[in-house]
């Protein structure tokens, strides 16, 4: 149960973090049944006096962006992942264009980090209108701010858009907190993190590594379910989020979901989210999910156009080399058909429904484990 006070406190706090201007136009992409969109894509612009334009459907988003020319977009990472994939696909045929795109992103990223010298800044100013301009024009040509939440943002995606000159801010929240808990600021943006807590929101990490939240936006409780409420909300008002996290220099870094932890047959625990994010940094992988609960090793389910398992294992190994030795992919199940919302394999914010995906491919997973490890 979210009260008017819960929601309005969240709206007021969000507007202290993100600036909306009188000339802005916000495009709404996500379902209004989701609290992220309801607060950030509806109540926040309403409070700021900013008009909201609604896309007809995700499949018509490109046309709507060109027509509406929004300045602000609130979306889940998957929207930008798809957009970037299309850009990279278009560049694949021209090594020169691909090289110029990569150079522009690299220079823009160095500028964002404050590490660009005078020559690099001059070169970026030269390349940006010629390389970044045409790409950002596909987003309508006026987009100045992208607020991303609802699922983890890949660093590769953030780096690409920020490098092109778009301000992309990752935030974090959950429905039980109305929903925004934290967010990066335009003047203090660290895409590795989800930013600092909103004004008035307190956070801490308990002994189990789980993020706890307290503040005026935290729910009253679950409807007619005192037992479920007591399980996540203590007498002091601390809400158990179910997310594993670290707090570094005041910023929150989400490490995964407590319920998603995979316990291997040797008792070692693996948080799949960080590993999956690292894998998605490789353009070869479109969608991924690690499995291995109660098993001796991990198997990767990957939506990809590559069919050679040895190639896929090598790419996975390269992306996971900095992880512990237990986070190693020994087999890959290559899948051509993407996981979709219509099929019931994604949430409304386009996060993978792990149980649903596992159930769909259960027989193939069992078969792979029966056949054992493949030597690369």
Show which residues each predicted segment covers.
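Conserved AMP-binding/adenylation subdomain of ANL enzymes
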Residues: 8-25, 32-132
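Gly/Ser/Thr-rich phosphate-binding loop
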Residues: 71-74, 86-189, 202, 286
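Residue-level signal for inorganic ion chemistry
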Residues: 73, 150, 203, 250, ...
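Conserved ATP-binding/catalytic segment of the ANL
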Residues: 197-264, 281
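Adenylate-forming
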Residues: 218, 251-280, 307, 325-328, ...
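C-terminal boundary motif of the adenylate-forming
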Residues: 244, 281-307
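Conserved C-terminal "lid"/linker of ANL adenylate-forming enzymes
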Residues: 287-289, 320-376
């Amino acid at each position: 149960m979210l009260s008017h006070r819960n929601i309005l406190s969240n709206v007021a706090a969000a507007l202290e973090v993100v600036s909306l201007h009188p000339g802005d136009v916000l495009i709404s992409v996500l379902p209004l049944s989701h609290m992220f969109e309801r607060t950030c894509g509806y109540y926040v612009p309403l409070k700021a006096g900013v008009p909201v334009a609604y896309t007809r459907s995700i499949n018509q988003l490109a046309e709507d962006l060109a027509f509406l020319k929004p300045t602000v977009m609130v979306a889940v990472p998957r929207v930008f992942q798809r957009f970037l994939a299309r850009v990279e696909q278009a560049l694949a045929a021209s090594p020169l264009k691909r090289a110029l795109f990569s150079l522009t992103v690299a220079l823009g990223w160095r500028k964002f980090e404050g590490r660009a010298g005078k020559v690099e800044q001059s070169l970026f100013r030269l390349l940006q209108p010629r390389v970044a301009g045409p790409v950002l024009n596909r987003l309508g040509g006026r987009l100045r701010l992208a607020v991303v939440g609802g699922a983890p943002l890949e660093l590769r995606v953030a780096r690409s858009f920020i490098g092109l000159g778009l301000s992309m801010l990752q935030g974090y929240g959950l429905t039980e907190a109305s929903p925004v808990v934290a967010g990066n600021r335009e003047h203090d943006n660290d895409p590795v993190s989800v930013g600092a807590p909103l004004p008035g929101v307190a956070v801490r990490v308990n002994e189990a590594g789980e993020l706890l939240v307290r503040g005026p936006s935290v729910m009253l409780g679950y409807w007619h379910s005192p037992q479920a409420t007591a399980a996540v909300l203590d007498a002091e008002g601390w809400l158990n989020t179910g997310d594993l996290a670290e707090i570094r220099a005041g910023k929150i870094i989400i490490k995964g979901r407590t319920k998603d932890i995979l316990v291997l047959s040797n008792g070692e625990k693996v948080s799949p989210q960080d590993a999956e994010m690292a894998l998605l940094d490789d353009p070869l992988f479109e969608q991924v999910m690690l499995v291995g609960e109660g098993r001796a090793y991990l198997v990767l389910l990957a939506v990809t156009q590559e069919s050679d398992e040895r190639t896929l294992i090598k790419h996975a190994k390269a992306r996971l080399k900095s992880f512990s030795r237990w986070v190693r992919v020994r087999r890959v199940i290559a899948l051509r058909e993407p996981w979709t919302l219509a099929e019931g394999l994604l949430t409304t914010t386009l996060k993978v429904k792990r149980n649903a995906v596992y159930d769909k491919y259960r027989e193939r997973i069992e078969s792979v484990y029966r056949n054992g490890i493949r030597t690369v």
